[in-house]
Structures are given as C-alpha cells and as structure tokens.
C-alpha cells in the first residue's frame, strides 16, 4: 500500500472504477483498482472481538467482555486498553477496519443486541466509546461507530420506521455518537438498518450530511450495515459512501445509469470516492497487504487484560451480612445451568470462536482450596446442547466428519467435493467457499459416533437455514425438511428447532448422521429477514430429565453445604442479533431453582450472567447477588476473582434493572406495529423515566457495592466566566475528596449529575454529566476532578429554534458514588444562549 494523492487519483479514475469503489466485492472486502495502486481493504466484525473473515470454521480470536460489561466498569483507561488490544487483534487478522463499537441506546430491556452497547445513558456510552476508539485507532486500525442511529430493536429491523422527536434524537440517541467524536474522530460510521421518521437512515440526508458532516464537521467514511442499502440515487446523494457487502445490489451498472441520467451527478460520486480513498490513506501505515493471512495472538499479557476486564465488570448488587468474599479454604457447592457453560458472548455479529473459554465452575475450582461439588439445578438451554463435542469420528477423533456434495443424498454415485473435521455442531456457512461449488445450493452429510454415559430417552434437535434430517443408526429421528417454522437463531434466518427422541443404552455406540441441504432447499418465507449466504445448521441432544428432580436435588445439597454459589442467567441463544427477547424472565425453571435453593440455604450467593436486565422475583431472599454479564474468554476466572476477593468489585450498573417488564418506559411502544415503532417515552429513557415518575427500579442505573466503604466530602466548583456565545463550552471543574473508610483497597466511581432549574419545558429530574474512577488504599484520601462543559451540562434541544438551548437559571450539581451519600452544590447560568455543533 502507498499513500494516495486523493485528488489526482479521482481525476485518473474512470466512472466505472469510481462506481466499483463505492461497493464491497464480497462480505468483508472493498474493491481495488490495481492500476492506480488502490488496494482492497478488509473489514471485520468487532463488537467484542475481531472475528476475521469467517463465521464458519474461522481462526480463533480474543473475546472481550460484552459492551454492557465494559460499560459497568465506568473506566476510561480500561476502555482505552481494550481498544488497543482490539486494534492489535485486528492487525493479526489482516483487518484494516473494525466494525465497532456499537453505541445504540437500550430503550428496552428486550432488545436483542442490547448487550452490544455500553449504556442506556449517552454520556456514559459516548465517553467510554470515545476512549475505546482512541485506543483502537492508535494502532492504525480504523474504528466504526455504529449503528447511526436508533437501531434499537431487532423486530423488522430492515423495514421498521422509528418515529422519534428531534429532541429525543438529539438528547438521547445522537448524543453518544456526538460525545465519542469529541474524544476520537473515528475513521468510519455505519448507518442503521431502520427508517427514521419515514426515511431509511442510509438514504437520510438530514442524518448523514446535515448533522454528521456539516454540523459536526466529520469527514470520515459512511458505510451501510450489511444489506442495509435500499436505493441507488437516494443513498449516494444522501452521503452513503460504501454499500456493504458485495457484490453490489444498488451500485454498479445501476449507479452508472443514475449518473448518465442525472439522478446522481458524477461530482457526488467523486465525493463518495474521496472518502473511500481517505480511508485508504488512514490505514496505509499499517502495511497490511491485500488478502493477508489470519493468525492468532493469544498472548499471556492479553489474557491478563481480558481477565482484569471480566473481573472489573462484575457488579456487586447485594452483600447482606458480608457473605462475600467467600472463604477459599472452605468446601463449596456450585449449582446452576451457567456453572459449566462459558456464557462468554452474545449471539450474532458479536459471536466468534474464542481462543479458549473459562467456565465459572472452572474459575471457582482453580481458586478453591476446599472440595468443589456440582449440582445442575436446572437446564436452561433454549435449544438442545450441542452434540458435536460429544461425538467421535470413525478414526477416534473428537467431533464429526463434514462431507460436502453438489448433489442431494438421493442422487446415486454423487461426488464428494470437500471434507472437513469439525467439533462444533453449530455452523453458519455464509462465508464457506469451495471452487467446485458454483451456487448457494449444495448438500452436506455430517457423521459422527455417540456413546452415551447413561441409559435413557435422549432428545435430539435440528435447527437449519436450509433443510435437515437427523438419523441415529440409520433411523430417522428428526425431520426438519418440510412444514418448516421460522425461528430466531442465526440472525433470524433459521427454523424453529425440530425435535425427536430415541431410547439409548449407556456404553453403546450409535452412528449419528445429519443430512443437510443449504438455504435454497428450504420452503420458509424469508421476507423481512437479512439473508446471509448459503445457510447454516445446528444439532444437539440431551438425556431427558425431570426439572423437578434436578431442583430438589440441588436444594437438598444446598441445605447441607457451608458455601453455595448459584450460576444462572442467559446465553447467546437467548440474547442475539436478529431477535428481541419476548420477556425479561430467566429461562424456564431458573427462578424456581434459585428460590428453592435460597430457601434451603439463605446464604447462597447468586450470580447472574446476562447482557441486559432480567427479572429477579427472588431478589429479596438473596443476601449476596452479582451481575456478571457475558464476560469474554476469561469470564469464569473474572467471576471467581470477585467471589474470593482477589478483586474488590467497583462496577456500577450501566442500565436500570426494572422490577418487571411492564415498569420499563418503552413497554407500550416496543416492536414494530404495521411497520413503525413510536418512541413514546421521548427523552425519558432508563433512569430519566424512573426518577421522573418516582418509580423505584429493582436496581437503579449507577448502582454497585464494594467490599470496602467510601466517603465523599469537600465538593467545590470552579466555573468559567460566561461569554456571548457558548461554542467554546465554558468548562466547569468539580473537585471532591474521596476517602476509603474501610479495610480493603478498592476503587470508587464518582458520578456527577446536574439537575436543571424549573422552566417551561419538561426535563429529567437530573442527568449524568461526568464521572471518574479512583483507586484508594484503606484510609487513603484523594481529590478527584471532573470537568464538564457548561453547554453540555445545561442544554436541551429546542425544536422550534433547531438549536441547543442553555437556559438561564440555577443548576444543582449532585455527586454520588457507592452508598447513599449525596453531595450538592450549584452554579448559575446568567443568560439563555443557543448553539450548534459538536
């Protein structure tokens, strides 16, 4: 790669070459023009790890804690470190552009991708995202803020029209993008799938050009989400530089024709190409060649950072009677469906094949010096557990054979064209390629041998994007080839899991075969769903057991144990791109199991893993409760570090946890109805709503305890004299003394809130405007400074003037942290002023 003379290159490009540059060539690469030294660039998903170019059978990667977990750290320095490692992982994968971070707002607990965004609050989300991007781009890799904007649900995400006031748009949904860009000018922005007030974002000139480019002065590259381009002329004229993925649907000959008919002028195409070439120059110093090989890093120092991030994200929700930390020397009983499952990431774009994972059971076992016992408690899988890791090939290897054909099984003498050895029996084939496969229609036989450890009836399940028949010893057990039903897996492309059963004997070996046909063989109606490649498969199995039997056994064991930890929650099956959750509840049986174990042993510790809030009807019984999110590679070790006190928890909730789904402000207005969703809560998202209507959530935004105690004192403000205009921001510096009044070293997160004066406009009771994290030894006191700009601390969006309004009056400043102590002071705004810009 070489630095390009952008203007000279534009002059030398033909119209056909310009048009080609404005769209990808495949799922992960941009177009090249070799004669002018313009190479193809590689892009890769990056919500919580850099997957590389393959969903299917790809090169493993580091998996970071999910964004809500990172949001819970409230730690800008940590986010900077995470961003740097993300950049280094990207370079190892030969990737120039990371498709992240996600900074949408969780207006509902049910959003399928809620775990991908940092927080329900734009200030927390935007500041963390800015530092994350700064660390990432320091490596030379380009960051992509997404999804711009209001991509806050999965239901009908390609078509839904988000009806939202401009005030809510500015104060809630655009704010994290605005604040992130003040900290780090990211190289890229990705548009959202949805419409806003009638127009798809990827062709919305007001959003892309008027606000992003002109008002904010940003000059990077705007790309579509994958298959999120819906027009030729409208999108190119609105400012969409790059259509992804390729091959193009809307550019190519269609764009050339639009230019020839003056639907789009060539100088507009030049503007799009200019941004693409500027991106080439941004990433050129990396020296990553076209189609670079992908490799793994997995360095010890990276593992240490991942473990620290996992531990620092764990929120101590309750710790009555100082149940925690646990005693290492005592025996411990570990209960629950998440104990031996590594719930390390959510589903969809965030999913990847991690270098390794650590389950909570493994994490606890590694640190306990006493006996560690286990009880299942309940099964909480949405679909049957993967069978692949329990199979063996005919030559004794773990896993199964994956044999590919162009013809169906009914064709005699068909030719084998590819054979792979796999362990995971879940595969999304959107990037599988073979030179002998010319279309998306092909067939796969997956064959392995299963030897059960116990007698019983075994349930088998098959989920496909395509068709599938599962045989056990040549007997058809599951037929998922006819009368298929739409499911939620694999971005919403897959069928419902179809099941069948067979009685098996312990120690006897059975041949298991899945006959799979790719997506074109399916009869599902896929309208409104993003179609990703040739299809996918998933097959699982489990011995049929009684949940009541499991719960009773767990409760009985708990009644006799001195230390008990329950691990429950969700997994990537329940929280995933392509599907919103139907409710906030834990999987069936989980609440009953937790409640009965707590009845049997009131000192049992409950650990919940989920990316977004869940209901906790047993919370009043629990003395000790942790929220542990999806913690990445090191999730099990991170949780164990907090349980045993190696790490003193400091995390605070980045989301409000309502008592029940009906309490959340978007309850009446979530999901698409007749193609639209009304953002009826307006600016009252999350804590803004609960505080305005005086409705207590189960656990509020910003809540989190510690193994030590803190006090705050000596709050003071230093303000900047007012000027006629507010464009320079007029910084306000809050200084507060923080003391560790306990006996354990720990970190405190100081939160600065501003409450507006009474005006003629309805405003939230208070809003977060700044925060800082400080580490203190026992008895140590430090002064903490938080600087906020007056214009950001005081302003609301005036729809009549189409400007931010900083109104005259007295503004109260509140400083909070761990515990109930609130420090207060105030400052004056002497004159109402209006402003625009970043």
UniProtKB/Swiss-Prot annotation:
Pfam families attached to this UniProt entry: Fn3-like (PF14310), Glyco_hydro_3 (PF00933), Glyco_hydro_3_C (PF01915), PA14 (PF07691)
Catalytic activity of the protein: Hydrolysis of terminal, non-reducing beta-D-glucosyl residues with release of beta-D-glucose
Catalytic site: 225
Localization, UniProt: Secreted
Record's keyword terms, sorted: Carbohydrate metabolism, Cellulose degradation, Glycoprotein, Glycosidase, Hydrolase, Polysaccharide degradation, Secreted
Enzyme Commission number, as recorded: 3.2.1.21
SMART domains reported for this sequence: Fn3_like, PA14
One GO term describing the cellular component: extracellular region
Family: Belongs to the glycosyl hydrolase 3 family.
Listed name of the protein: Probable beta-glucosidase I
UniProt organism field: Neosartorya fischeri (strain ATCC 1020 / DSM 3700 / CBS 544.65 / FGSC A1164 / JCM 1740 / NRRL 181 / WB 181)
Organism classification: Eukaryota, Fungi, Dikarya, Ascomycota, Pezizomycotina
